[in-house]
């Protein structure tokens, strides 16, 4: 079945396979040519639509095609996604005779010529849970070649010196037959209908082509013979690792764990993809029967590609004897499915996929240059201070690559976040995805860019004091993974399948109730070894600062797919396994961030959060703390279910701040979307369903989220009031999971209004950005925000108190936050901890204050706004304390023609020594921007700058 190679995110559950139905169909005309219109008709009596939850007769065809050699399988361009079929492929229902039909011309439908066979199945719009028919294939053309022995595209395993009998006939009568082996003509027979030939004394692997020519119509069948190399045992050095070990510029070692397999060949560009017995891998019986081979004579720096040909002479029922697969430890794979659609601007000079091969191949290259890291000793922000910005590279900007992030570094820097968390960037199936359908966990997905480009982004972040966290999906793998395919059930013999009972890495059936893809068995030492290699690869080679572990509920072996209660209960094996992975991460980097998306019971989460937290280098695992519903109730203006105390670690009784509280994430509906759809409208002058009104309430959201001690997270463009629904479709429409139309657009690529409409220049959106930037800076720079807190919430006027009694009275040691999410102004009793002067911490000048003589005197807060008071000015952020000479630097200075500034600014003014304004510039000036002053006379000038927060600074400039 073809669904395993597609651009999708499939939900598989234990009971899902029962939903497949075998249909009855007819094709007219039959046989048919590729340029002839055909009609496929499905008997409605053979389908129980209700089994798939279909009530409106919405069925779809999912189709693919083969070339004339019955290879080079390509999906129909209009398939859509497995979870959301394209309407072009919808079948027409004929109620009169209860049939479904679709008509098309193969050349047009598949956008190709030279079609030898087509395949199709019928499915629901969302095919999740195997809501599909059986796979059906149809030969194209009235002239067909029937190969009796061996079968087309088959592989026959023989011993050296044995023979192979080849028999075939055709549907057109007498024809000319030509048999080639490894490109050399072996036999020719003319003007015959039935062909027979025996190839004797075969001593090398053979790639056969049987060409049949009938009056210029040519069909070529391909098949193979692989020689069993017999006993080939060898002990390898203990320094050789799974995957590639580079010895020198001319030598590489390949190691493959393939338990239960009889022998393995390595086929690649270095042997023209025709390996002889010298490329049979040795088996090391002292290291779990791992296979290994030494490749010598490689050209330094030359790109080579390879696959493993893995053979099991006594394969389990429905499992293939031969699997051709890339290396499971690949760091770069080439894909015939995805690579043709990768823009050269994202991945320049992408190596070409080798002609004539199928499925992924691994790239090998000796003599690679090390990346020239600028920052080699990055000091991570403390866990308590983290402001994490979650990013999906695909939806961040129009080019959908790492360069987009690099180009927008000032956007991150000026927001004053100190960590960026990338949704999965490991090699996933397809190009446009959330990334959780990973197949090669050590390989970078090329759609986003090159390895060096990701390293450049990480290095740039570190230069700007920003940590980089990777989201990893290590609870599962998808169908292209070698760890799936080497031990799989492939009942329809299409090269794809599910893990079988012999699979050492993956469970045959999922052992938890939230499974996607195929479920890893983390109790198996081989799986643990693989996971640890993945961790080591990204930490050592990419200087990744931490991992966010997706769906940690899946790391148990104790449950079943339909037992949600078990999955959500405390599981000791899951706790221990994930502690082991955390320990390994900390062994590589004691300050490594370990983050779990568990969203489960507090017993497990507390055990992880408190784990090793009191060491001299504090550890402790950070947990995602979802608070979307409660915060959205506030932003919409509803006085129910709005207790936000769960955003802080005290609510979970954690020893230390290890809860990453958030109001939005990639997996939840946008707060602004719901504000506009369902917001409170009881006050016409403050209608939350009005865009600008809804935006005006989002600064207060930041005030009651980001300030709470402990790590916090922002979902991308929340700081600009992004209102596009999570269910926004490619075309900008919205189709949710509850809409009448089947399917939803949750996983669709999203539009980019934040840049195309220049939201940073929008006053209402820019205010959110600047307010959150100010809050983030307070959070990360002021010690009090690592102190204690209390939250008074459960109404529309939440109050937050933050304090640190260890700080001096001359320091900022108490913070009081008052917010009003009502649609009317409210007088809020502040309950200040003591009387005296309290300063407005949102005023960068430090000049706004109130004199509190009674701590209970109400303070008026207008609808949707907030107040943040401190007992002292922010000593680190006040404009009055903004060091002129040390903070603002011009280079070169003195200068003759131009200078650059070490800060991102929005305004620059040049004054002469008398105070006269000579020159003024406004704009979004990046750090390092060049300013030309050739028009100025020689002498001394005063340069005054202002950034987006309104902070100003001045310094001297000498013009030569």
Where are these predicted regions, by residue range?
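C-terminal outer-membrane/trafficking sorting elements
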Residues: 7, 881-960
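Aromatic-rich carbohydrate-binding modules that target alpha-glucans
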Residues: 58-111, 248, 255-303, 311-339
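Solvent-exposed segments in extracellular or luminal domains encompassing
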Residues: 191-207, 930-932
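Basic K/R-rich, polyanion-interacting modules in nucleoproteins and related proteins
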Residues: 226-264, 323-384
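Substrate-binding/active-site clefts of carbohydrate-active enzymes
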Residues: 328-330, 368-544, 551-570, 580-589, ...
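Conserved alpha/beta catalytic core and glycan-binding cleft of carbohydrate-active enzymes
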Residues: 543, 576-723, 727, 780, ...
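Residue-level detector of functionally pivotal "anchor" positions at catalytic/ligand-binding pockets or at interdomain
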Residues: 688, 788-790, 794, 871-891
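C-terminal beta-strand-rich structural cap/linker in extracellular carbohydrate-active enzymes
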Residues: 853-876, 939
